[in-house]
Amino acid sequence: MSEQPAVAAGQAVLVTGAGSGIGLATVQALLQAGHPVYAAARRPTHLQMLQDLGAHALPLDVRDADQVQAAAQHLQHQGLGLWGLVHNAGVGGLGVLTSWSDTDLHDLFNTNVYGPHRLTRALLPLLLAARGRVVCIGSQGGSITSPFMGPYTMSKHALEAYAACLLQELTPHGVAVSIVQPGAVATDIGDNGRVANVARLQSTAAPFDAAAAAVLQVLHEAPALQSDLPESNSNRRYASPQAVAQVVMQALFDPSPQARYLVGTRWEGDRVVQALTQRLLDAARSPSHQWTEEEFLAHCRRAWRDA
């Protein structure tokens, strides 16, 4: 890369996975609003592109503890502090749950869960000093799951718990924590792991082989959106990365940010709320509770009023 641009004074924000998709859209939104941005990415082509946009390009693989520490030291030496940390770097993955090797599962968690933890820990002194913000890019898969999406949604469930605990621990010290839950978004996260996904699906053994073949067909021949038909699992409406980035901006700069932002279509939101409601019902009906319908509804009404 050529010489880095100077990082302007102000509310500096670090965005991981900044080379494409939601990360790139967030960098662009931040720059447009006049904020200094540390744009973290792995690929040299992405780093050069981010630098050309006016961001401070930061080589960073969140799986690499040495790179994480080097990034933290670099920010310390810049002397600008750090207002916001956006955990966007992530990987996906398809395949029947039992087809995943220990190594593949660990690699996925290393990026999606351990990576945010490493970076938060390294940058915590700066965030505490600024009384700033941490924003985790989760997924609606952090609340629900579906066949062939097990490991990915496991990692997003873990990130949900991580963000919830971090919120409780950091709020007393002035740092706000939010998690953004997009639904289907037009990004290249699926393309990045396409070769591994196809290989895993092609090698799926009975009794899961027929279902895996159906998923493979969708990967190879993704059906066009039927705008005149209701949205469904097979007829999805994709949000733009820019729409998610605007929600990230709210989480970063609203005076009273929400703990959770659900982003997507009404169909996606209904699906999440229904799944969470079923989980509540399962707990309320457990042998140790056995709530009546009225007790359950009274609890929901109180929660709604207190929110």
Language-model features: where?
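Active-site helix of classical SDR
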Residues: 120, 155-158
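Active-site loop-to-helix junction immediately N-terminal to the catalytic Tyr of the SDR YXXXK motif
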Residues: 100, 145-153, 165
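Conserved glycine-rich cofactor-binding loop
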Residues: 19-20
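Residue(s) in the substrate-gating loop at a strand-loop-helix junction
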Residues: 139
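Substrate-binding pocket helix/loop in short-chain dehydrogenase/reductase
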Residues: 96-97, 104-106
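Rossmann-fold cofactor-recognition segment
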Residues: 53-66
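SDR active-site lid
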Residues: 172-257
